[in-house]
């Protein structure tokens, strides 16, 4: 019997796939558990239209992520932090600090999408990666300045 998986099932496939399984397995386990539905002509057509709609949504998200990446690349970010006389910071500049600076510029990004190669503990210029979409990653440059010092 052919079924359409509603959820990811180990050793069978991912949600949305059409797979062939034995009748007993489908009728006694997959369908009652809500893991699959019978693959009829109507459900297959509905699956195809749903896949097309999701592809359109993903393309729109990808396009907006690319536009946002272009905006972020143009930004000159400055992070203010408390520092000693030698230029060493009291603490570190984290992804949350960069997310806060981006938010002040009008771009709201979750701090978990920002990665830095190493902790920033001194004044200077640095780069971080921002993952906006599965295949859209932008490098953002930022400068760490001592708090209260105007450039």
UniProtKB/Swiss-Prot annotation:
<keyword id="KW-0694">RNA-binding</keyword>
<dbReference type="Pfam" id="PF03948">
    <property type="entry name" value="Ribosomal_L9_C"/>
</dbReference>
<dbReference type="Pfam" id="PF01281">
    <property type="entry name" value="Ribosomal_L9_N"/>
</dbReference>
<keyword id="KW-0689">Ribosomal protein</keyword>
<dbReference type="GO" id="GO:0005840">
    <property type="term" value="C:ribosome"/>
</dbReference>
<dbReference type="GO" id="GO:0019843">
    <property type="term" value="F:rRNA binding"/>
</dbReference>
<dbReference type="InterPro" id="IPR036791">
    <property type="entry name" value="Ribosomal_bL9_C_sf"/>
</dbReference>
<comment type="function">
    <text>Binds to the 23S rRNA.</text>
</comment>
<dbReference type="InterPro" id="IPR020070">
    <property type="entry name" value="Ribosomal_bL9_N"/>
</dbReference>
<dbReference type="InterPro" id="IPR036935">
    <property type="entry name" value="Ribosomal_bL9_N_sf"/>
</dbReference>
<keyword id="KW-0687">Ribonucleoprotein</keyword>
<keyword id="KW-0699">rRNA-binding</keyword>
<dbReference type="GO" id="GO:1990904">
    <property type="term" value="C:ribonucleoprotein complex"/>
</dbReference>
<protein>
    <recommendedName>
        <fullName>Large ribosomal subunit protein bL9</fullName>
    </recommendedName>
</protein>
<dbReference type="InterPro" id="IPR020069">
    <property type="entry name" value="Ribosomal_bL9_C"/>
</dbReference>
<dbReference type="InterPro" id="IPR000244">
    <property type="entry name" value="Ribosomal_bL9"/>
</dbReference>
<dbReference type="GO" id="GO:0006412">
    <property type="term" value="P:translation"/>
</dbReference>
<dbReference type="InterPro" id="IPR020594">
    <property type="entry name" value="Ribosomal_bL9_bac/chp"/>
</dbReference>
<dbReference type="GO" id="GO:0003735">
    <property type="term" value="F:structural constituent of ribosome"/>
</dbReference>
<comment type="similarity">
    <text>Belongs to the bacterial ribosomal protein bL9 family.</text>
</comment>
<dbReference type="InterPro" id="IPR009027">
    <property type="entry name" value="Ribosomal_bL9/RNase_H1_N"/>
</dbReference>
């Amino acid at each position: 019997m052919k079924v359409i998986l509603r959820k990811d099932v180990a050793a069978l496939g991912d949600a949305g796939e059409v797979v062939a399984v034995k009748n007993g397995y489908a009728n006694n386990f997959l369908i009652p558990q809500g893991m699959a539905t019978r693959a009829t002509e109507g459900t297959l057509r509905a699956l195809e239209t749903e896949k097309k709609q999701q592809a359109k949504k993903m393309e729109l998200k990808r396009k907006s992520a690319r536009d946002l990446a272009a905006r972020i690349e143009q930004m000159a970010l400055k992070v203010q932090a408390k520092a000693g006389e030698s230029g060493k910071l009291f603490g570190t500049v984290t992804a949350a600090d960069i997310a806060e600076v981006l938010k002040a510029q009008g771009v709201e990004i979750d701090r978990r999408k920002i990665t830095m190669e190493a902790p920033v503990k001194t004044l200077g210029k640095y780069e971080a990666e921002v993952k906006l979409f599965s295949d859209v990653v932008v490098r953002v440059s930022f400068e760490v300045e001592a708090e209260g010092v105007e450039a």
